[in-house]
Amino acid sequence: MASNSKKKDVGSQYKVLFTLGHGSFGTVKLACHLKTKALVAIKMVELSKKNIRGIRAEIATLEKLQHPNIICLFQVLVTSKHINIVTEYIPGGNLFDIIKEDGPMHEEEARRIFGQVVSAVKYCHNQDIVHQDIKAQNILRDEEGNVKIIDFGLAIRCRSGTLLKRQCGTKSCFAPELVLQEPYDGKKADVWSLGVLLYFITTGYYPFRGSTMKEMEEKIATGTYDIPTHVSGQLENLIHQILTVPPEMRPSIEDIERHPWVKKTEVNNPTVTDPDYNIIEMLCGMGFDANEILESLQRKKYNESMGAYLILKAQVDKGLEHTSIISAKPVDQCPTPPPSPPAHPSISSLLLKRRASEPNFSLLHIQPSGEHRPVSLALPGHKVARSASMPPIALHYPEKKSNSSSFALHSGAVAAPSVGNSILEDELPVPPDQEYDMGACFGSTYTKQCDMETPSPPQKISRFKRMSKRIRACLAQLCCIPRAPKTKKKHTSSNKIAP
């Protein structure tokens, strides 16, 4: 990072608007980039020795990932007290909130959305990166209806032939091998989480539910769930294939992409291209130096110059003309933010600290083959799910290639290595070898609070928030800015199945 980065604070480059989310590990703010007037999300993490290693690992992962369905890193700004990670702002909300408000998706829409998620996960797995916390809260939908995966706080680099031992992620999305505390293949665990996600977006609730944590874990370990009758045969087949208890029989991400139900997303893998000199010319008109911009891009500094370039490039990639990006916005005016802070638990979870707030219920080791399993009565309007020992339903599903490679037991996860020219190498001291309190599978077990049942509708807005919302609305009217139309929420029961 440029040597002058410490001399500048966030306020010199961004106008912070309000908080999107917060937690014990950091706070995510909605902000306006002063030079380009673009809205961004800034995650502010306290600069401390226990956080440095985790932040370095996560930033290195974000640097490595460039995919249209993965959150884009713009800049890393280090101040005397905080590390500020600037990413693109996705205003459409997360899939969890969307499903809770609008109900489950129609299959055609779910095919498109799930295909994009599969494409992004495949891109990560091809680089030996596993996410480890795939869930609806960590998938945002943009204004065009496309989705992006966020929150790579638990993402790790897994060498081929490595088994992981540390438990991390969200309990309701745990694979059986994690519940049983067995060494596991990170990619196969990601695949299981994709199955939970697919079930949720097409039914509106989780496949494994129980009145207690132990009951939920027992259902996960035995693969006990039911399928609503409205689910098509191909979708049912795909869910059964993914939620296969033995990990060695579980399909790979490539197998899932080839399934006839999945709508494959054609993505041109981004390649190193020459800088857009039209963007550089625009930045020079804002006071940036062309040579510094080129050097920052070449060395991947993710400093102020590179951040401004990436922010403008993101706007151009969305179809905005070079000349209209700046000319349509007065120099001293940022876009009007939403009338009230949007509910963005997924953004707030971006790199937020995991909490070890859930007890580990010890379960007997349940062999997935042949042993008697507890009987699960089907609810009215539901199909009885196949057990882990039942053969998969054949619906032109390609044979899964057997993986004969042996796995070496690994004592822990391998963190994504920092890039040689990482922006933090010259900015932050490297602490002595120690476990950092981030939940990146290096220390004790870290899990996010799981959703055992479909949560109840949000509580009523407080008087202060209502007053704040009215003030924002009045200001919007005074500025002659039309308010965004309200979307009517549909309060559906957690057990109600859409026809």
UniProtKB/Swiss-Prot annotation:
Residues 274-314 form the UBA domain. It catalyses: L-seryl-[protein] + ATP = O-phospho-L-seryl-[protein] + ADP + H(+); L-threonyl-[protein] + ATP = O-phospho-L-threonyl-[protein] + ADP + H(+). ATP binds at residues 20-28, 43. The keyword ATP-binding applies. Keywords: ATP-binding, Kinase, Nucleotide-binding, Serine/threonine-protein kinase, Transferase. CDD domains: STKc_AMPK-like (cd14003), UBA_MARK_Par1 (cd14337). GO terms for molecular function: ATP binding; protein serine kinase activity; protein serine/threonine kinase activity. The keyword Nuclease does not apply. Its EC number is 2.7.11.1. SMART domains: S_TKc (SM00220), UBA (SM00165). Gene3D superfamilies: DNA helicase RuvA subunit, C-terminal domain, Phosphorylase Kinase, domain 1, Transferase(Phosphotransferase) domain 1. The active site is at 133 (proton acceptor). Belongs to the protein kinase superfamily. CAMK Ser/Thr protein kinase family. Smok subfamily. PANTHER family: MAP/MICROTUBULE AFFINITY-REGULATING KINASE, SERINE_THREONINE-PROTEIN KINASE MARK2. This is Putative sperm motility kinase W. The lineage of its organism: Eukaryota, Metazoa, Chordata, Craniata, Vertebrata.
